[in-house]
């Protein structure tokens, strides 16, 4: 069974975990509808790249 030979300090542990974190989604203002949406996704109204791609029922 592997056991640690030396104690890792708090700074060493935090340096190792520095890449772990939350990613902020890239939210943009849609030019055609004026709604906020995540980039490279269809807007809630069904518009993508200035074209209606999904018909709302």
UniProtKB/Swiss-Prot annotation:
UniProt superkingdom: Bacteria
GO cellular component, one term: large ribosomal subunit
GO terms of molecular function: structural constituent of ribosome
Gene that produces this protein: rpmF
One Pfam family matching this protein: Ribosomal_L32p
Cross-referenced NCBIfam families: rpmF_bact
Basic residues bias locations: 9-19
Biological processes annotated in GO: translation
Chain intervals for the UniProt region annotation (Disordered): 1-25
InterPro entries: Ribosomal_bL32 (IPR002677), Ribosomal_bL32_bact (IPR044957), Ribosomal_zn-bd (IPR011332)
Family: Belongs to the bacterial ribosomal protein bL32 family.
Name of the featured protein: Large ribosomal subunit protein bL32
Keyword set, alphabetical order: Ribonucleoprotein, Ribosomal protein
């Amino acid at each position: 069974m592997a056991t640690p030979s030396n104690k890792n300090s708090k700074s060493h542990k935090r340096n190792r975990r520095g890449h772990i974190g939350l990613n902020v989604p890239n939210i943009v203002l849609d030019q055609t509808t004026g709604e906020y949406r995540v980039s490279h996704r269809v807007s809630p109204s069904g518009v993508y790249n200035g074209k209606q791609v999904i018909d709302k029922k």
